[in-house]
Amino acid sequence: MNTAQLSIQQYIKAKDGNRPYLLDQAFASDAVLDMVVHTGSISFPPHVEGIGPIGDVLVRRFGQTFENVYTFCLGLPPEPQARTFQCKWLVGMSDKSSGEARVGCGVYEWQFSAESGLVERLTITIEHMKTLPASDVHCIMKWVSHLDYPWCHPEALVNNSPDIGTLEEVIQYVTADTAI
């Protein structure tokens, strides 16, 4: 049986590494994905049902557009038998076509099966998705590649963040002490 933490980690490994075959170690076959996007710089369908379509959206199509993907869950992982879990997240990546860097953040809301530990429902809220010039890719990748992965404390993230004005809203969001 999976644990909540392992299911989350397998999802991140699948998405970041463009490995859709790993999703069956993260999601139930009839899982549901809801996307809430509060930015115009990236788009996703608002509702997806089933592991196949979820894989198309979160791994296959995502992997066609982005590379050098690092996704972080901020804070401590869930308890092994957790039925629900919420955390802020941060992603750093680069666009395959333009070479531009992307840094985004938001909230994950997970619901897990009591029997299998697999994800039954995931709501991903995207609060910010910043686009930076290709000249910033190196410093963004240097930053994110040195963070604890995939579980990272917000303080560590901020202490090592590059001094780029475009990132201010992202840094403020992930460090804000607000209830999720």
Explain the meaning of each model-derived region:
Residues 54-57, 70, 93, 108-112:
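Short, surface-exposed linear patches
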Residues 2-9, 13-14, 92-103, 109-180:
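Terminal "cap-and-tail" regions of soluble proteins that handle hydrophobic small molecules
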Residues 18-34:
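Short, well-ordered alpha-helical segments enriched in acidic and aromatic residues
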Residues 1-2, 33:
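Generic signal for short, ordered secondary-structure residues
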Residues 29-88, 180:
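A solvent-exposed, acidic/Ser-Thr-rich amphipathic alpha-helical stretch
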